[in-house]
């Protein structure tokens, strides 16, 4: 006796198989590029101070230069737009961090400092240009899946409209994180980083759902440090040599080591992360700039 195909005896098996195939196909077809929100423009400036030349100045001239620099930096500091840090180690002596609404305003901040006499004693060592960025992996996967299930083609008019609606809702909800003031914490740790794009390990070729899963795991580590450290992530693809910049603000520095060490063990950091130089500094309030310069 010839046995009937399982799909005829159990038609639900055929349905389940086709459903699984559809789910797999849907996953493969999800748009690969996650949505991001951008906020303030950010510039880090690292300088070496020319102490031998500075010491050759008279005390009155030093005081004059210190007062001029403080006058230029005090207003943006009070607004949470600029901050000065005394760097540890040989990578530099001072680091200035600027948060502004645009690159034009960042350039104006640079030029304003360049026009002061203090600039004659600041030797540029490094800089980093970026914008505050919030990655929307969770929202992206949810939205892209819904659109794919409805058969909405990526980049179509309907697709773009729904994406923009989602972006606008998130933009309003995330506004405080997109447009923050520079935290007044005593310590700052800054470093740039990439996601690997090598032949063996390439972050950008992973399915978006897998990237979303790994980033969620990564974020859970950071959330355990809430209240101990404040993190601001900036995007720099197309702006600087690395893909992201990371600023960590805290009242004591050991938390930087503990947080970054723990993150080394999550999958996305262990397999796909590459890091640049680390800069650690102590907040130098503008009213104490003269003290830092040794001006009595």
Residue ranges and their predicted role:
Residues 8-86:
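An N-terminus-focused feature that recognizes amino-terminal "leader" regions
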